[in-house]
Amino acid sequence: MDSERDAVVERKLGPGDILPQLGQILQANAGFALACIAGLAAINVAAGRVSSGLVSFLPGAIGGVIAHYYLIATALTRLGLRKEGTPNRFWDFWGLLILSGFIALLGLAALIVPGLYLNARWAAAGSVLVSGDSQVGAALDQSWTMSGPSAWAIVATWLLIYVPILLIGMTLAGVLGISTPLLAQSVTQIVWSSAAVISWLMGVAVYSLLRPGTVRLAEIFA
């Protein structure tokens, strides 16, 4: 067991490791991922049109947590990393998101880089918890340990994915917003929902590459 843990700690990933694994996971879960994107975008657009202020974010936030949990649970099951009969960890997962998100937001409020770094160190925490391996504190600790040597590579991978997505989304929203505000709002929500879903599955990719007994999705379906 100790030798497995040491092997995980010493492993260092790069974007060239993470992106192919993420691509395989997205392909294997494409239907569910697209449903999450469409559903979250629709909820947020509708909520924004019938309410204002913080209340308008509440339906999307709740829907996001539910979609996040069940999407990564499905992806982990397809990878063979979550066994049948694993207890439902939804409420623990909610608590984990609140705790890690609050601390990461403090980092982002101080400086952008610390927030990105904290997010990278805890990128796999949700997958650790949902797979049934640990409780909330232990999941955060295990993710922190696993991702240490790869933290900046995880940040770099996020930037490689999100910067082009956000630039395209903002450009389209700006062009469409002049004549069709509703369409512009819809495009914006689709972009943000896509970024969220990719982020969730990237956490699964990082976990699947760094956990003891690492396996690549391509090997499972070979």
PLM features per residue range, with description:
Residues V45-V55:
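Short, hydrophobic transmembrane alpha-helix segments
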Residues S52-L54, L81-R89:
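Extended interaction regions within the primary functional domain
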Residues D2-E10, P59-L81, R121-S134, A153-A222:
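Juxtamembrane transition segments at transmembrane-helix termini in multipass membrane proteins
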Residues E10-A42, T86-L106, A120-M170:
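Interfacial aromatic "cap" segments that immediately flank transmembrane helices
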Residues C36, L40, S56, G60, ...:
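Alpha-helical transmembrane segments of multi-pass integral membrane proteins
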